[in-house]
């Protein structure tokens, strides 16, 4: 693994993953996470040389023994003479008590792999195992890690890590929308963390930014077990995810700002960040933000599969103001609005990106 090359070109890799490999039309879209919706609807293939370890609960203690057992079981599934199905044989769905620890190397796992689209290892709590198709996908404290296939057999694994923060206006979205994008980044030799966080209006500020901090604490404290090099830690965020990423970095890099906050924070800073189509100028009322998240255009009401879009969901929010859907008290509201005033020299190097027709382009230009 050419670690020096990866560190040098991290911003280029972020960009290439989002634009060239994921969806070239991204540059003409009105907003970044629309590309993720489109990618999902088009059913893009996942890279065969990337494995997803799914549904670790970052608000609970990591079961190191179980984590390593699942990787060992997954590796046993690689040893097969069925060369006609080599890619599919790398896939295995593992659900807690259904795992057979006596699984033999010469047993073909083809029957276990039917219908799976990509390499997946499920890490679900026993209480969720029976309902893995719903609870384990929607839990707001679940995370996935996307890893290069070499990670699974590397006994001394220590990979650079990218934390991806999904977008959706703080009230929409989940990790599944970003799984393809995260797998593409993992192809370059990274462990990519893809996670859910609490959404509004059910969860007000600071729930989302607290969850970002909880997540980063989790990977920091479990870096050795997870096989990550915390000294080479990066973040990428889209839309609301970009705002959360920037907000986390402001909090982590500015002790004065951090001292004013009355919720859980963490101070581990990423080396570099990539901010895609973010909303940063929270201190001013921006009609483009309201128009983007709250409009109800006929053309955008439904996705190509006929499902209700996020814009229709937005109409059900109590307030037309994004800030009111996100913030709670006047004091918290002011700190949220004034966050850009607290950017200092310790803020990590940032790669800012926006699409040509992005409604929030002015926000990126203002902080560039």
Across the structure, where does each feature detected by a protein language model lie?
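Alpha/beta-hydrolase superfamily serine-hydrolase fold, recognizing
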Residues: 2-368
């Amino acid at each position: 693994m050419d670690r020096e090359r990866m560190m040098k070109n991290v911003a280029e890799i972020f960009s290439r993953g989002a634009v060239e490999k994921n969806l070239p039309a991204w540059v003409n879209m009105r907003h970044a996470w629309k590309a993720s919706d489109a990618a999902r609807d088009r059913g893009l293939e996942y890279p065969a040389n990337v494995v997803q370890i799914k549904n670790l609960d970052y608000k609970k203690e990591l079961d190191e023994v179980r984590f390593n057992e699942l990787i060992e079981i997954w590796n046993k599934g690689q040893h097969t003479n069925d060369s006609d199905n080599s890619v599919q044989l790398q896939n295995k769905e593992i659900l807690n008590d259904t795992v057979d620890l006596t699984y033999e190397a010469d047993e073909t796992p083809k029957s276990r792999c039917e219908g799976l689209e990509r390499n997946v290892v499920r890490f679900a709590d026993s209480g969720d195992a029976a309902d893995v198709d719903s609870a384990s996908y929607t839990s707001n404290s679940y995370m996935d890690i996307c890893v290069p296939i070499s990670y699974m057999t590397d006994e001394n694994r220590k990979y650079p890590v990218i934390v991806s923060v999904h977008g959706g206006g703080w009230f929409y979205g989940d990790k599944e929308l970003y799984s393809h994008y995260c797998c593409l980044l993992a192809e370059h030799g990274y462990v990519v963390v893809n996670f859910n966080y609490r959404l509004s209006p059910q969860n007000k500020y600071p729930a989302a930014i607290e969850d970002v901090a909880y997540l980063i604490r989790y990977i920091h404290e479990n870096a050795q077990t997870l096989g990550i090099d915390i000294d080479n830690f990066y973040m990428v965020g889209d839309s609301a995810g970009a705002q959360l990423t920037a907000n986390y970095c402001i909090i982590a890099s500015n002790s004065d700002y951090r001292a004013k906050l009355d919720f859980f924070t963490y101070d581990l800073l990423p080396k570099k960040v990539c901010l895609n189509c973010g909303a940063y100028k929270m201190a001013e009322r921006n009609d483009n933000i309201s128009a983007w998240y709250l409009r109800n255009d006929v053309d955008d009401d439904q996705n190509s599969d006929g499902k209700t879009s996020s814009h229709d969901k937005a109409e059900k929010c109590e307030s037309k103001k994004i800030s009111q859907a996100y913030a709670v008290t006047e004091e918290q509201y002011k700190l949220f609005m004034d966050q850009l005033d607290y950017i200092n020299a310790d803020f990590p190097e940032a790669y800012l990106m926006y699409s040509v027709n992005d409604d929030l382009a002015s926000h990126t230009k203002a902080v560039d």
